[in-house]
Amino acid sequence: MYNRYVTGQHFIGRKDERAILGNLLSQSENVVIWEPFGTGKKSLVHQVFTKMKVDGNRFSVGEMTALDIREGEAFVKRLGAAVIRLVASTPDEYEGIVTKYLEGTHFVFDRKAFSDLDVILSTNWDLDDNDLKAVLRLPYALAAERGEKTFMIIDEFQNLDLAGDGERIFKLMEQVMDEVKAEGLRIFSYIFIGSQVNAMED
């Protein structure tokens, strides 16, 4: 995906921004890019990843949108599914990851739900904070197992803040980020892209 240069008016004067973003990502720092809709945020990220590829860096990039997210738990499920799809592609592989990394949680891989609804993460009970943190730790664990830097782009992340339990999810994410940083695990990071668009406008 990130193998061609992108040019356009939005990149005039953005050389410094590209350099700063590239430096942050090379250190596996989490990044927030907050600008109005249509100002070239994704293209900026695209260019940085392209340069990283040209420079010989090996990494994986996943992407998800939070535009239609109205519940924090739905956000976590979508994030978990996006992370799993980044490293697996078959039902057996999906089930293997859920069994290995989410054992002891209320998350399961339901083959019927996957077949009927393309759902990777189903639940067998109400979710608690430990369940959610297990999924939030998943991208770090999978990246470490593969030994490859991994980035997850979350587009329109501001919608999580509008969700009823959004603050809870943000706090859990911060806890996990602090924990993995303390463990010295610097192989995964988020790129949060935000604008003024939100699901409540639908």
Model-predicted regions and their roles:
Residues G13, M64, F192:
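Small/polar loops that bind or transfer phosphate-bearing groups
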Residues N23, T50-V54, A141, Q175-D178, ...:
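Short, well-ordered alpha-helices that flank and scaffold nucleotide-derived cofactor binding pockets
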Residues N30, W34-F151, L160-D161, G166, ...:
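P-loop NTPase nucleotide-binding core
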Residues A19, E73, E201:
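Alpha-helical elements of the RecA-like P-loop NTPase motor core of helicases
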Residues A144-R146, T150-I153, N159-D202:
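Sensor-1/coupling segment of RecA-like P-loop NTPase cores
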Residues M1-W34, V54-D55, N198:
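A short, basic N-terminal segment
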